[in-house]
From Swiss-Prot:
Molecular function GO labels: rRNA binding; structural constituent of ribosome
Membrane keyword on record: no
Task performed by this protein: One of the primary rRNA binding proteins, it binds directly to 16S rRNA where it nucleates assembly of the body of the 30S subunit.
Pfam family, one: S4
Coiled-coil intervals: none
Subunit-level organization: Part of the 30S ribosomal subunit. Contacts protein S5. The interaction surface between S4 and S5 is involved in control of translational fidelity.
UniProt lineage: Bacteria, Bacillati, Bacillota, Clostridia, Moorellales
The keyword Ligase belongs to this UniProt entry's keyword annotation: no
Gene Ontology biological-process annotations: ribosomal small subunit biogenesis; translation
Gene Ontology terms: cellular component: small ribosomal subunit
Protein name: Small ribosomal subunit protein uS4
Length: 208
């Protein structure tokens, strides 16, 4: 699948907020947004009046980039959210949170969603005891996500286990860093999703 190849820090600066695309670096003084809180490029520091459509588009791009999803797939998630009962914008965020790569990241088993996506693709994770190497796989309440026994012995996952012990996990998940195993306790509520999103703007954009 095609992916954005330019600097991920430029994406954060373009959106004017931290997208947490580079793991621990995003929490440090090295974060590009902390050092240069204006868009990249020659005219980045110039002030522009943004139209209503521009605000909606930027919000969609921001959320899409946070979860590392291309436009067609993001549109598919929106259409699925629209068909579900409830608030479309909230349904959209819940679907994105249920992605296996996001859950691996939320459990603390990867520094970033991009790293989680790579680890899932390489077959390091099991869902209910079966290998799943599809990052977009949607987890359900009651699912158990674990690291393959063979992978646990690698230096990489020993580092992950050590780091995971100090990471906060959202209330809808439960993680055990000693066994590198996590459980989906429930679907997340909107209040439990800390993604900096104004999802109503995305709904307005796609409703045009």
């Amino acid at each position: 699948m095609a992916r954005y190849k330019d600097s991920t820090c430029r994406l954060c600066r373009r959106e004017g907020t931290k997208l947490f695309l580079k793991g621990d670096r995003c929490y440090s003084d090295k974060c590009a947004v902390a050092r240069r809180s204006y868009p990249p490029g020659q005219h980045g520091q110039g002030r522009k009046k943004v139209s209503e459509y521009g605000l909606q588009l930027r919000e969609k791009q921001k959320v899409r980039r946070i979860y590392g999803i291309l436009e067609r797939q993001f549109r598919n998630y929106f259409e699925k959210a629209e068909r579900q009962k409830g608030v479309t914008g909230e349904n959209l965020l819940i679907l994105l949170e249920r992605r296996l790569d996001n859950v691996v990241y939320r459990l603390g088993f990867a520094d970033s969603r991009a790293e989680a996506r790579t680890l899932v693709r390489h077959g390091h994770f099991l869902v209910n005891g079966r290998k799943v190497n599809i990052p977009s796989y949607l987890v359900r309440p009651g699912d158990t996500i674990s690291v393959r026994e063979k992978s646990k012995a690698s230096p990489k996952f020993k580092e992950i286990a050590e780091a995971a012990a100090h990471r906060n996990v959202p209330a809808w998940l439960k993680a055990d860093s000693s066994t590198l195993e996590g459980h989906v306790l429930a679907l997340p509520t909107r209040e439990q999703i800390d993604t900096p999103a104004q999802e109503h703007l995305i709904v307005e954009l796609y409703s045009r």
